[in-house]
Regions:
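Hydrophobic, aromatic-enriched alpha-helical segments typical of multi-pass transmembrane helices
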Residues: 1-181
């Protein structure tokens, strides 16, 4: 573990920088979708749950990247136990913490979209499955084989958010046109 971080400290530092940078647009996306849902007249808890999840995912990703940055410091990686502990902290914040937040963000968009017909039903249902698997990923903290759910939430959730961002109507009039009203 020490060799991985101390042998490539410049690369680790760049990874931390890029990961931190990716957390900012996620938070902006969550706020933008929240505002769009309110503009669409959605007055149920879903938008607030999604906003909370998006902020949580963004903050967890930032925290993970800051810990990774600390791991790029040669004065830290001289201590093998500390390096190992910080690597676990980076993993749990950037893995479980991020994916649980991502699942809430996806659910906060998918549930109202399904109920109100704001996107194709298959896409909304796919979002619900991704959200459920993302929430179950927290069990990987005690049932280690469930870490396989982390990439489902991370990559599946990211792909789903891109699709939802394009398909979620920008106004009530657009939603009505889509639904034939």
């Amino acid at each position: 573990m020490v060799a991985r971080f101390s042998g490539a400290s410049d690369v680790v530092r760049v990874v931390a920088l890029l990961q931190f940078g990716s957390a900012v647009p996620l938070g902006i996306f969550a706020a933008t979708v929240y505002a769009r849902q309110l503009r669409l007249g959605i007055r149920v808890p879903g938008p607030a749950i999604g906003l909370f999840g998006g902020i949580l995912a963004s903050v967890m990703l930032m925290a993970s990247s800051l810990v990774i940055w600390v791991l790029s410091r040669p004065e830290v990686t001289v201590d093998a136990v500390l390096t190992h502990a910080l690597a676990f902290l980076a993993f749990v914040t950037g893995g479980v913490g991020y994916v649980v937040g991502m699942g809430l963000l996806v659910a906060g968009i998918a549930v109202p979209a399904l109920i109100l017909g704001l996107m194709p039903r298959w896409l909304a249902w796919t979002g619900l499955v991704i959200a459920a698997l993302s929430e179950l990923a927290y069990l990987s903290m005690v049932i280690e084989p469930l870490v396989v759910l982390l990439p489902v939430g991370r990559f599946g959730g990211g792909i789903w958010l891109i699709a939802a961002g394009f398909l979620l109507p920008v106004s009530r009039a657009a939603a009505n046109r889509r639904n034939g009203a």
